[in-house]
Amino acid sequence: MTTARLKNSAIVGGVASALILAGAAITAAQAKTVKVELTAKEVTAPSDNEGHTFLAWTYNGQIPGPLIRATEGDTIEFTLKNDAANKKSHSIDMHSMRTDVLTNFASIKPGETKTFSYVPDHAGVFFYHCGSDPMIQHISRGMIGAVIVDPKDPDAMPKADREYVLIEHQMFDNPEDVDGMMANKWKHDAFNAVPFQYDPVHDEHATQTLEAKPGERVRIYLVNAGPNEFSGFHPIAGIWDRVYPSGNPKNVLVGMQNYTLAPGDAATFDLISPTEGANALVNHSMRAALSGAIAIVMFSNKADPSMGHGDKILVR
């Protein structure tokens, strides 16, 4: 190699290295810290649309717990508190995290606090729940939630016009009956903890539906919290435009009528309706659907613009 070529090679290499370093610096600068605080609370919560209640175990007094959202590469600083007024030990199991189960996911007693941080390195939608013994009871009584990790590449998926989070789980008649839970004697299957919460067709006491306009891309994040049943997720009168198993943009299926999630699994579903009218999102296991796992999406040119955005992504 001549001296001139050597100099040119060095210059090109130096520029390339500088660009790589600059890109790394930009990526580091874009990454942010997301602080999450959850408090385990044993409270009274609604069990249907008519005002009946049960003694629930929750995160922050809500079922599901708060939606946790970050971008791939962010740092999540997490704190779990077990309210001193509680009677039980509680914990966290985050499916978006790779860690030591014996430390970060260990139970804490009433009045105790646990903190840790992690960097979510896989984009997608993930389940979080209490892992304390008996886990089946902690899940069924309400200690469930969702984590959305958005891809760091904003163009990795088509842009959604609206987003909704649905967390499906079985509800048991007696929340103290662990043997009944193990025997799978559930009474209701519900989206976001209230049977038929978004279905005034099957429950006259239901007061809300999900909303969108025709032609909009509606993105549904479904978490199957179980604790026991699979979910065959189908949009009646529609077809899933795209399905992303685990919500990862690298996993994409097109034109699906139904997609099945195991207990503890999650996926992202895109739905587009060309016309006004209704689609019914169901677990196509009829026992599950007819005991509560139905959510109506109303497609209307007059759809509420706030629905599917901000605090109306997880509609309570």
Predicted regions and their residues:
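Boundary at the C-terminal end of the N-terminal hydrophobic targeting segment
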Residues: A28-A31
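Acidic-aromatic/histidine active-site loop/patch
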Residues: R162-P214
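Short, glycine/small-residue-enriched coil/turn segments at secondary-structure junctions
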Residues: I63-I76, D203-R217
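Bacterial N-terminal signal peptides
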Residues: G13-A24
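Histidine- and aromatic-enriched segments that form or immediately flank copper-ligand environments
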Residues: V34-T39, V43-I148, N228-L261, N279-M298
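Extracytoplasmic/periplasmic copper-protein system
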Residues: T33, E42, S140-P175, S246, ...
